[in-house]
Amino acid sequence: MSLKEKVHAVFQNSFGCEPDLYVRAPGRVNLIGEHTDYNDGFVLPCAIDYETVVALQRRDDDKVVVVAADYANQRDEFSLSQPIEAHADQLWSNYIRGVVKYLLEKGLSLKGLNMVVSGNVPQGAGLSSSASLEVAIGQAFNDAYQLGLTPAAIALNGQEAENKFVGCNCGIMDQMISASGEKDHALLLDCRSLQTRLVKMPDDLAVLIVHSNVKRGLVDSEYNTRRAQCESAARYFGVKALRDVTLEQLQQAAEQGKLEPVVYQRARHVITENERTLAAADALETGDLEKMGVLMAESHNSMRDDFAITVPAIDTLVEILQQHIGNDGGARMTGGGFGGCVVALLRPAQVDDVIAAVEAEYPAKTGLKPTCYVCKASDGAGIF
């Protein structure tokens, strides 16, 4: 049963009628550009064909009624005319409440909706299931009430909900790619200006995401530490963010003993990762998969050695993928670190053999079982 069929059936059961509209918003994978977003840098994600789908019906009053088809049809109801508070027991509700709260704060004219929500973005895998939900809800209100919001406005509203209402300090990348992705393209995003450039992906290219199934500990505290180290390096140079520092300036400061070695390493990752991300957009566009593979390997090594956010099982998984893909693509860890997923780019003809190799070798070397997702670069949010 497709997601659309699922939300349709649950909608009929819950509300006894047909929905007015269906909207969708995808998850994402970041091909390269890690921990650069909060440093005002560049990222190169693509939307994937795992998504959140909403069936909706306009209401004449100010009540929002949501049914979560993936959580045993749990319901949430709240009013647009009362202060929107966090739900004490249902975490999923807060992503929706937060999005609606910040739409209202922008002075937009909303009425209520009946909604059924379902998604197949793997949770806890670093593929942005939460951003997909936030963007889907923003898109639902935008399309139901002709709010005229741009994809960037829907993305920023979702980020605001996650930062302020849910309490997770994410950058803008996840919501932005979910809102504005395009089929068969990656999106080069400047996280400072929010300018985007669509990057055509080669036709004969597969995106393989492998979940390491490493239990992730320390992610939040380590993330905050890395962020603070990057900010202290930017402060030393008197700039807003590491985006404004060159590698030459950084090396000069290090040679003069002006930076702690660990801060130097963290900053070196960010500065070189920005350079790699810009180069990767060009390599992808020209179909130079060998160059793309080199850049992905350099990115992974930098995350391992300078930013110190990989773990041994992830390094092993990347090595297995690199070995079996060869020179026609590459692999690297993607996401915040300390577990999560590896992203690989390879020829479609290689996919089955590479998955078989990963499923044989990774458990033998780590005792962990991988989960593989073969994806296509997909369209961003919209009605369907």
From Swiss-Prot:
NCBIfam families in alphabetical order: gal_kin, PRK05101.1
Active-site annotation: D174 (proton acceptor)
Xref: InterPro entries: Galactokinase, Galactokinase_bac, Galactokinase_CS, GalKase_N, GHMP_kinase_C_dom, GHMP_kinase_C_sf, GHMP_kinase_N_dom, GHMP_knse_ATP-bd_CS
Source organism of this protein record: Tolumonas auensis (strain DSM 9187 / NBRC 110442 / TA 4)
GO BP annotations listed: galactose metabolic process
Pathway: Carbohydrate metabolism; galactose metabolism
Lineage per the UniProt record: Bacteria, Pseudomonadati, Pseudomonadota, Gammaproteobacteria, Aeromonadales
Pfam families in the record: GalKase_gal_bdg (PF10509), GHMP_kinases_C (PF08544), GHMP_kinases_N (PF00288)
Coiled-coil blocks: none
Gene3D superfamilies associated with the record: 3.30.230.10, GHMP kinase, C-terminal domain
GO CC annotations, alphabetized: cytosol
Catalytic activity: alpha-D-galactose + ATP = alpha-D-galactose 1-phosphate + ADP + H(+)
Binding site for substrate: E34, H35, T36, D37, Y223
Annotated protein name in UniProt: Galactokinase
Record's signal peptide: none
Keyword annotations from UniProtKB, A to Z: ATP-binding, Carbohydrate metabolism, Cytoplasm, Galactose metabolism, Kinase, Magnesium, Metal-binding, Nucleotide-binding, Transferase
Residue numbers marked as site, Transition state stabilizer: R28
EC number: 2.7.1.6
Binding site for ATP: G124, A125, G126, L127, S128, S129, S130
EC top class, as a word: transferase
Record-stated family: Belongs to the GHMP kinase family. GalK subfamily.
One MF term in the entry's GO annotations: ATP binding
Its biological purpose: Catalyzes the transfer of the gamma-phosphate of ATP to D-galactose to form alpha-D-galactose-1-phosphate (Gal-1-P).
UniProt-annotated location(s): Cytoplasm
